[in-house]
């Protein structure tokens, strides 16, 4: 049967799919718009399942914060390519997930995926995005802060996001700290927060290096002590030189402002993921196989 251009247009607006896909679905269900939309949804879920094993290591980090500034979230949403990750549809989806994570107050990823936005679960919306954009889309992780202190956030483009909780100080201090964390990548707030096993491992490495000098053991111990102190200042927020004024440490800055950092999180797109090195021809072939 033939279907009207208006019906095809309506289905495209509802599903975000291509004209030929919409026309084919409408023909298959004899022009029933609702049935065509449901058919395309089911086909989209099947496509999502087929794409689930493909590596998604691009995308963006997004943030949302409450009006009073005392709660906030960071969310990483992944795509397979930066082209899709920079697109308007992907950005809108990622931002809606972040807002949902903030509003719903969920504590884990499964609960976030099960929560609803405009009557659809985040997981259903994710699967629809897979069908619409033709790539594996993954809501990878999120973190939520809520308490009595101010939460500051900073996004460096779409690839790095920081959230820091600060007791005392003002809005500008919070933003400066978030920018510093984005640039300097501290592991934790203070030396007391460094895991004991990590500290012990680093000390063993430094000890082995120092002993190669052939110096007496008491000298070696002092060498290790100095190098360990330097290492801790490099990886902890309080010990790092402040990026906007390297003559003072972040710890000195906070002391001068009468403020304290209680916790922070730094997300970078794709960190810890193994990216698949694929040629353009391989990428095209993969898309053909999945179409």
Curated annotation (Swiss-Prot):
InterPro entries: EF-Ts_dimer_sf, Transl_elong_EFTs/EF1B, Transl_elong_EFTs/EF1B_dimer, Transl_elong_Ts_CS, UBA-like_sf. One of its GO terms (cellular component) is cytoplasm. PROSITE patterns: EF_TS_1. One of its GO terms (molecular function) is translation elongation factor activity. It comes from the Bacteria. It is found in: Cytoplasm. Pfam families: EF_TS. Residues 271-291 are annotated as: Disordered. SUPFAM superfamilies: Elongation factor Ts (EF-Ts), dimerisation domain, UBA-like. Its main location: cytoplasm. Coiled coil: none annotated. Residues 81-84 are annotated as: Involved in Mg(2+) ion dislocation from EF-Tu. Keywords: Cytoplasm, Elongation factor, Protein biosynthesis. PANTHER family: ELONGATION FACTOR TS, ELONGATION FACTOR TS, MITOCHONDRIAL. Belongs to the EF-Ts family. Associates with the EF-Tu.GDP complex and induces the exchange of GDP to GTP. It remains bound to the aminoacyl-tRNA.EF-Tu.GTP complex up to the GTP hydrolysis stage on the ribosome. This is Elongation factor Ts. It comes from Halorhodospira halophila (strain DSM 244 / SL1) (Ectothiorhodospira halophila (strain DSM 244 / SL1)). The lineage of its organism: Bacteria, Pseudomonadati, Pseudomonadota, Gammaproteobacteria, Chromatiales.
């Amino acid at each position: 049967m033939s279907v009207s251009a208006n019906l095809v247009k309506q289905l495209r607006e509802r599903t975000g799919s291509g004209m030929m896909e919409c026309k084919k679905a409408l023909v298959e269900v004899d022009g029933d718009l609702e049935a065509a939309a449901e058919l395309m949804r089911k086909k989209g879920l099947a496509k999502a399942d087929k794409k689930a094993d493909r590596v998604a290591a691009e995308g963006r980090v997004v943030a949302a914060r409450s009006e009073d500034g005392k709660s906030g979230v960071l969310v990483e949403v992944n795509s397979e390519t930066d082209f899709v990750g920079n697109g308007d549809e992907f950005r809108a989806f990622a931002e809606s997930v972040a807002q949902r994570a903030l509003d719903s107050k969920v504590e884990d990823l499964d609960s976030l995926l099960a929560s609803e936005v405009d009557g659809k679960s985040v997981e259903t919306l994710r699967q629809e995005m897979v069908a619409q954009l033709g790539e594996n889309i993954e809501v990878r992780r999120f973190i939520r802060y809520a308490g009595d202190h101010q939460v500051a956030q900073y996004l460096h483009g779409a690839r790095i996001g920081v959230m820091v909780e600060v007791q005392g100080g003002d809005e500008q201090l919070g933003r400066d700290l978030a920018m510093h964390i984005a640039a300097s990548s501290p592991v934790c707030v203070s030396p007391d927060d460094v895991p004991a096993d990590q500290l012990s491992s680093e000390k063993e490495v430094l000890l082995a290096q120092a002993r190669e000098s052939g110096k007496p053991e008491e000298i070696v111990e002092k060498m290790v002590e100095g190098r360990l102190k330097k290492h801790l200042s490099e990886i902890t927020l309080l010990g790092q030189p402040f990026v906007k004024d390297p003559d003072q440490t972040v710890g000195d800055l906070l002391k001068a402002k009468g403020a304290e950092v209680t916790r922070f999180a730094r997300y970078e797109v794709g960190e810890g993921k193994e990216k698949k090195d694929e040629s353009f021809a391989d990428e095209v072939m993969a898309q053909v196989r999945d179409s």
